């Protein structure tokens, strides 16, 4: 996870000046049993959405792109190819109607949904095993009926955050880590001077299962302990250290760690633009505004 963190901070450094349509992002909701991933990433200045979720023998794979990203939403008729598609009745996803097609390929039966809404387009693919697919028809229809595009993610658990005005959201993803929905959000200042990642994980899962593991993962052995900070009335450890990024460069960094009974939290701040008075002031603003909400 520390290697992933270094790579993420290096990415934030590159994307510091990127701009994307943070407003209007839509999340796919539905009656799922488990969620592998669900969220947005900023790629080449545009947001991309991905969701992988399951219910019994049914698997859903969804991707979404901003309309101006350069990608195109093609219906099966437009895409061509050798597969035979059956046109199905449109599905209502709340924010828009989705065209629907059915086909078989690679040992699975697929329902393909295509939808455009609020400046984004989404491709949603629902797969069941081809053998015995008919016995799952009712479950597939029930799952499709439960799908909706909403302005907020399916997440009722408090998340760590701060005053990120003037920052660009680079990533916001959820994933079922075995004990509940974990979440990662990452932000970069417009000038690339400061970046921050916020992480939440179930307290029963490594490295969120103890304060020691949080320190090992997010601060490291050579970190300097600073005065604790308070987050929503709870005391949290603060550490200062140097991260060696994926490209080999060094980055002054700080971590704030908040263990909990159900969920634990970590915030990692990178002075990706160096230790300047402006970046130090921005870091203090972030630290002073840390809160669970």
Where are these regions (language model features)?
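N-terminal targeting sequences that direct proteins away from the cytosol to non-cytosolic compartments
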Residues: 2, 6-7, 11-58, 85-93, ...
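Generic alpha-helical hydrophobic packing signal
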Residues: 64-67, 98, 200-202, 234-236, ...
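Residue-level signal for short segments within beta-strands and strand-turn junctions
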Residues: 64-66, 151, 200-202, 243, ...
């Amino acid at each position: 996870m520390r290697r992933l963190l270094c790579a993420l901070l290096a990415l934030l450094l590159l994307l510091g000046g990127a701009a994307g349509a943070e407003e209007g992002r839509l999340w796919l909701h539905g009656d799922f049993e488990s969620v592998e991933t669900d969220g947005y990433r900023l790629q080449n200045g545009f947001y991309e959405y991905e969701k992988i979720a399951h219910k019994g023998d049914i698997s859903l794979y969804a991707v979404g792109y901003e309309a101006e990203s350069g990608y195109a939403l093609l219906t099966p008729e437009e895409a061509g190819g050798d597969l035979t598609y059956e046109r199905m009745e449109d599905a209502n996803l709340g924010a828009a109607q989705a065209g629907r097609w059915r086909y078989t390929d690679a040992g699975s039966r697929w329902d393909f949904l295509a939808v455009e809404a609020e400046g984004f387009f989404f491709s949603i693919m629902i797969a069941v095993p081809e053998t015995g697919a008919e016995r799952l028809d009712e479950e597939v229809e029930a799952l499709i009926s439960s799908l909706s595009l909403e302005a907020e993610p399916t997440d009722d658990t408090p998340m760590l955050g701060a005053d990120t005005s003037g920052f660009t959201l680079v990533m916001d993803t959820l994933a079922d880590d075995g004990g509940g929905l974990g979440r990662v959000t990452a932000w970069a200042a417009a000038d690339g001077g400061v970046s921050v990642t916020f992480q939440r994980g179930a307290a029963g899962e490594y490295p969120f299962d103890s304060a020691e593991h949080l320190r090992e993962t997010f601060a490291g052995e050579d970190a300097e302990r600073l005065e604790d900070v308070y987050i929503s009335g709870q005391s949290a450890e603060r550490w200062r250290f140097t991260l060696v990024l994926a490209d080999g460069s060094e980055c002054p960094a700080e971590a704030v760690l908040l263990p909990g009974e159900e969920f634990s939290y970590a915030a990692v701040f990178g002075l990706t633009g160096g230790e300047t008075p402006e970046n130090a002031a921005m870091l203090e603003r972030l630290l002073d505004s840390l809160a669970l909400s």
